[in-house]
Amino acid sequence: MERRNAWLSYTEAEEKELEQVAKAYRNFLNVGKTERECVTQIIREARAAGYESLEEKTAKGEKLKAGDKVYTVGMKKIIALFHIGQDDISEGMNILGAHIDSPRLDVKQNPLYEDTDLAYLDTHYYGGVKKYQWVTLPLAIHGVVVKKDGSTAEVNIGEDEDDPIVYITDLLIHLAGKQMQKKAAEVIEGENLDILIGSRPLKDLEDDKKKEAVKQNVLNILKEKYDMEEEDFLSAELEIVPAGKARECGLDRSMIAAYGQDDRVCAYTSLLAMLGMDTPKHTSCCLFTDKEEIGSVGATGMQSRFFENAVAELLDAMGCYSDLRLRRTLKNSSMLSSDVSAGYDPAYGEAFEKKNAAYLGRGIVLNKFTGARGKSGSNDANAEYVARVRNIFDSHEVAFQTAELGKVDVGGGGTIAYIAALYGMEVIDSGVAVLSMHAPWEVTSKADVYEAYKAYKAFLLDA
């Protein structure tokens, strides 16, 4: 059942559309390197497509009807879009669910220190990372600083050409004999992922401050640019991410290399499919969650009540809320958990079982189950639902493939699918194959990005 490379089937018109999708996607990656930035961009694009704030419409007492398009946001890190359909919503929604957080380094609450005339920010890594991949790279600082008076300063350092970047050092090879004998997990330890941010001491300091003259200079710069004091780090969310824009990859420009493609490749293609919809038969929903990389925990993760509460508010705004109707709406819904899959890498072929692996360029990937070992932590989609999704994709000429996440007992991973399935709805993982997943720079195929967009659009129309 080997799948054909999707590139071989495209017409000239399809290739043109593919390139347009890929270009728009790269722009999304450039402006959305944190979950907050992604939510901001999603709102911007949704409003341009006619979406309105659910809270604003509710405050005005406006009732929702078929064709209305609304969104609701939680803590600036999670967002749901709804396009009201023609059928009774209790018959179920067609849902696309992606996550917009990605592995990174988070600045600690008390991070700034100086050592031998070098200033550093202490960090704590977020999500599953190979720590050694994060050293000796140009890095940027993104995030917010919230002061005691409630005012917020948005931080973005390292992306403009004139911006400085920050950096994590590594031991020079000439002195690394002992280091090179360590296991990969220990070569760079978590406490050594400290960000080099300065080396110029401030002049004319009082004697008691001369020992930390470089740190004082950094604080002066932060005060001048963001009006922040050192204490304001306590209420800051600063994320260290790779600096630089998404790039076309390969001499044939067939791929995209960028930070955060897990899972923003599925988030953006889901968004694009959602925004291009005419009034659907079934109500469409696009959900973008936070905290997936650390277990979907917290108030902005999928395990929170955000989604359930959002649907309840939607029903109330439609004038048809009841607890039973809410439960029926969720139970009768169909969902694609829009999350990435491990792309087969011939350089590491021993980690994959080739018949059940995802290949770049062969279309969107269906993962009937994920999890680890004996499918632990998995959502295992029903065969009837897999057949229905297959039929939808085939009817719309979507290139797709099926895969597992590597060989049995080699590793594993999870998504938000099993959490959504707790409502009794049908869910299957469906996303794009990625090379070097969770690395600072990941690689996807433009063809797979395009097929994901087509797949999500087909699902919203016909599921």
Predicted segments, located by residue:
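N-terminal hydrophobic/helix-forming segments and targeting peptides
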Residues: 1-463
